[in-house]
Every structure is written in C-alpha cells, then in structure tokens.
C-alpha cells in the first residue's frame, strides 16, 4: 500500500494568507496645511507646547502625552516602548519608570535616547533626541504623591521587565501591598522608581503634506543655548 508522503500531506493543508490585507495599497493622502519656518516658535519647547495644546484639545488623541521611548544597550541593540510624558519645560522632557527596568538600565549605560510623539490623527509627529539623566529624589517624590493610590502600589508590586510566573503572582503581590497600605494611607516612594529628564539636542517637527512631500523642520542645539532650524527633505 502506498502511504501518504510528507509532500502529499503538506499539499492537502490549505495555506492561510499570512497578511489578510493588501498592505501595499494602504495609504492616506494628507491634506493638512503646511509648516513653514516663519511660523516656528523661538525654541523647540515653545513649538512643542503649541502643538501639544492642539493635540490635547483638538487632535482626537486618546493619550496625547503617549510617546515611544527608544533606547539602546551598550552593544547598540535598540528597544522601544510607549511611556507617558509627565512634564516638559526648557530644561527637558520628563517621564517616570522603574529604575530596574530594561529602559532604565540601558539609559544608565547609554544615556542617548529618542522620544517619538505619533500624533497620527493630525498627520503630525515630533521626534526628540537627546541625553537622559535621572531626576532628583525630591522631584520624584513630588510627582509620586500625585499618582492614584493604585498606581503607587503598582510601582512597588511590579519588578518591571523581570520574568513573572503568572498573572496570579502579580495580583498577589499587589493584594499584599493593598492590605499593608489601604486607601488613605501614605505609600512610601520606592527607592527603585523615579524620573528621567531628556535634555534635547535636536527636535524635529513633521507635518504630513500632499504627495508625500511632507514638511520636516528640525531644531538643532547650538552653543550658548541657541537653536538653528533646518528643513529636511521628506
């Protein structure tokens, strides 16, 4: 009797389309107004404040302060994750995290970082590149006190980026902390948790335009605290 060969078995199994969409034809035509050099603010932080206000009030964004933070380890291997921006001013852009997390360990070894704000509904994005430094403990504590009680407990319960046995282990750690620090009781600031301030050396503002001829204007830091503006080809 003739058996079924591996080739016959393989051919009998229907092959699913790995991509059920025609990605090559998926595109949008941007029709937003452009961005010119004459419209820019004197500093990138002022310009960011303008755009952020629009993103937060008129942009239709769920979390306008969500940004993609990209870091690299000492061997140059990159990693990215979404983090919430919690403060910005002329001194830089601030976010908070577990200092034992992958991103924090990579920033301690290699402080060069990129922040990407993907404001897709507005056909805009902002890319900040610079150097990250830890914030002071007083600044960290002041922000920690503004967090919801549950988020404060979560900062203790999660050993961020470590392997956890299962969800029950994580929930169990949280439950123990909730019993120790019930609602209304002050939760101490974890020593392994705090902020990073990204001091920018370049900030690019991207505005989508028709025919993929987008506007890309980049502020580049110069000596003495000044900035020059460059237009980049799209």
Curated annotation (Swiss-Prot):
* One example GO MF annotation: FMN binding
Question: According to its UniProt record, in which pathway does this protein act?
Answer: Cofactor metabolism; pyridoxal 5'-phosphate salvage; pyridoxal 5'-phosphate from pyridoxamine 5'-phosphate: step 1/1; Cofactor metabolism; pyridoxal 5'-phosphate salvage; pyridoxal 5'-phosphate from pyridoxine 5'-phosphate: step 1/1
Which cofactor(s) are needed, names only? Answer: FMN
Q: What keywords were assigned to this record?
A: Flavoprotein, FMN, Oxidoreductase, Pyridoxine biosynthesis
Q: Which Gene3D superfamilies match?
A: Electron Transport, Fmn-binding Protein, Chain A
Tell me yes or no: is Oxidoreductase among this UniProt entry's keywords: yes
Binding-site list for FMN: 81-86, 96-97, 102-103, 125, 160-161, 206, 216
Q: What is its EC number?
A: 1.4.3.5
One GO biological-process annotation of the entry reads: pyridoxine biosynthetic process
Catalysed reaction equations from the record: pyridoxamine 5'-phosphate + O2 + H2O = pyridoxal 5'-phosphate + H2O2 + NH4(+); pyridoxine 5'-phosphate + O2 = pyridoxal 5'-phosphate + H2O2
Query: Which EC class, in a word?
Result: oxidoreductase
Q: How many cofactors are bound and how?
A: Binds 1 FMN per subunit.
Q: Which PROSITE patterns match?
A: PYRIDOX_OXIDASE
Tell me where on the tree of life, at the top rank, the source sits: Bacteria
Q: Where on this chain does substrate bind? A: 27-30, 86, 143, 147, 151, 212-214
Identify its protein family.
Belongs to the pyridoxamine 5'-phosphate oxidase family.
Quaternary structure annotation from Swiss-Prot or TrEMBL: Homodimer.
Q: Briefly state the protein's biological role.
A: Catalyzes the oxidation of either pyridoxine 5'-phosphate (PNP) or pyridoxamine 5'-phosphate (PMP) into pyridoxal 5'-phosphate (PLP).
Name it.
Answer: Pyridoxine/pyridoxamine 5'-phosphate oxidase
Can you name the source organism? Streptomyces coelicolor (strain ATCC BAA-471 / A3(2) / M145)
């Amino acid at each position: 009797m003739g058996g079924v060969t591996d080739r016959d078995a393989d051919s009998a199994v229907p092959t699913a389309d790995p991509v059920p969409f025609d990605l090559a034809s998926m595109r949008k035509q941007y029709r937003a107004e452009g961005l010119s050099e004459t419209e820019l603010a004197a500093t990138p932080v002022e310009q960011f404040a303008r755009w952020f206000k629009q993103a937060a009030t008129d942009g239709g964004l769920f979390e306008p302060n969500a940004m993609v933070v990209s870091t690299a380890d000492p061997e140059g291997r990159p990693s990215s994750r979404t983090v919430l921006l919690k403060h910005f001013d002329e001194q830089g852009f601030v976010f908070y995290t577990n200092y034992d997390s992958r991103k924090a360990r990579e920033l301690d070894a290699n402080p060069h970082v990129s922040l990407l704000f993907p404001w897709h509904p507005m056909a805009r994005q902002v890319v900040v590149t610079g150097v990250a430094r830890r914030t002071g403990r007083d600044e960290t504590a002041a922000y920690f006190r503004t967090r919801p009680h549950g988020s404060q407990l979560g900062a203790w319960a999660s050993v961020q980026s470590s392997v956890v046995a299962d969800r029950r282990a994580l929930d169990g750690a949280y439950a123990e902390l909730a019993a120790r620090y019930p609602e209304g009781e002050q939760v101490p600031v974890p020593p392994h948790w705090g902020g990073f301030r990204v001091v920018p050396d370049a900030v690019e503002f991207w505005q989508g335009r028709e025919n993929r001829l987008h506007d890309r204007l980049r502020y580049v830091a110069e000596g003495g605290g000044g900035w020059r503006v460059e237009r980049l080809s799209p």
